[in-house]
Design a protein with these regions (language model features):
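Alpha/beta-hydrolase superfamily serine-hydrolase fold, recognizing
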Residues: 1-151
């Protein structure tokens, strides 16, 4: 499931989740943050490619402020499942993921932010050459097992 779908299902109580793992999540088509500008090109994930993907996903629908598309515009996230948010320091999506984690916390949702210093978007797929990636995977597993145990 992608982040907007989980947001909609969980906040409408259509789905009961012990937790969610958001790994360098994309939270909307209009990325306008410091990290999206600083890491827009040359850091694996290109902002122009991300916008193209959203255009394909949304078609002609242009209401990017709809929380079903961009959960950062949600009026209320009360009842959303606990979240583990994995961010890479050198990722254009970093700042919006951190902002979403803050929004979840504002509505009383338990959030763990795991930031990989010096890493790029997609670093978890490189665990065979980046030992720190496996440390993040272990941290995610630990937090997720706690969420499930407390569900």
């Amino acid at each position: 499931m992608n982040t907007p779908n989980v947001h909609c299902a969980a906040t409408r109580h259509e789905l009961s989740l012990a937790g969610q793992v958001l790994i360098y999540p994309t939270l909307g088509p209009e990325v306008m943050t410091d990290s999206s500008h600083r890491f827009a090109t040359g850091y694996i994930l290109e902002i122009d490619h991300l916008r193209y993907d959203y255009q394909q996903y949304l078609g002609n629908w242009s209401d990017h402020t709809d929380a079903r598309v961009t959960p950062l515009f949600a009026d209320d996230l009360t009842g959303a499942p606990s979240a583990i948010v994995v961010v890479a320091e050198c990722d254009p999506l970093r700042d919006e993921a951190v902002a979403y984690a803050g929004l979840l916390e504002h509505f009383g949702v338990r959030v763990e932010i795991l930031e990989a210093e010096g890493m790029l978007h997609g670093f978890l797929r490189m665990g065979h050459v980046i030992p720190d990636a496996m440390d993040i995977v272990d941290d995610v597993a630990m937090h997720l097992s706690q969420y499930v145990a407390n569900a």
